[in-house]
């Protein structure tokens, strides 16, 4: 089914491009299904109290925040589902800022904090769709080539599942 993410995630001005990319990938071949932005619950009190995004939520959305719809299957979340292809999809947007000029982690937290959890996520997703048999597919899409290369290298992601798909208008 299509629904909100189980863990709180909020669209802000600074991460908007990642969510736009997620919806771009989710809707590439999802017809007749359609994924979009949706109103989340009241703004999370743990969010930064004086951020511009929180202020905008209160002034323009009566305290409600935006999030995106995701595909839920077998107790697992995916960024989208392509019905005709029986393919669940995951999208990874702008992560290149965490890589140095040699395509290594720019900061000490990057490998363990960003890339390593992706391996667990991919493993969970593969297990979730296994009950659907061989017709079920999982594809991960990356907006940036360097991010995809780093993810397969540092997180050990399955390179057969990873694909580069630039976002229209973005330089990858």
Where in the sequence are the language-model features?
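Active-site or metal-binding loop neighborhoods of secreted/extracellular toxin and effector enzymes
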Residues: 119, 123-172
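A solvent-exposed, charged loop/short amphipathic helix patch at secondary-structure junctions
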Residues: 94-114
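Conserved phosphate-coordination/catalytic loops
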Residues: 71, 112-120
């Amino acid at each position: 089914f299509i629904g909100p993410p189980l863990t709180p995630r909020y669209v802000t001005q600074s991460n908007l491009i990642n969510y736009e990319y997620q919806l771009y990938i989710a809707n590439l071949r999802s017809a007749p299904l359609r994924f979009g932005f949706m109103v989340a619950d009241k703004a999370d009190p743990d969010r930064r109290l004086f951020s511009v995004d929180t202020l905008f939520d209160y002034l323009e959305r009566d305290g409600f925040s935006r999030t995106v719809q995701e595909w839920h299957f077998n107790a697992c979340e995916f960024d989208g589902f392509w019905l005709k292809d029986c393919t669940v999809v995951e999208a990874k947007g702008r992560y290149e800022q965490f890589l140095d000029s040699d395509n290594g982690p720019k900061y000490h937290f990057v490998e363990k904090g960003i890339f390593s959890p992706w391996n667990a996520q991919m493993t969970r997703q593969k297990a979730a769709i296994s009950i659907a048999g061989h017709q079920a597919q999982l594809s991960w899409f990356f907006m940036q080539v360097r991010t995809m290369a780093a993810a397969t290298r540092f997180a050990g992601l399955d390179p057969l599942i990873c694909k580069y798909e630039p976002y229209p208008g973005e330089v990858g």
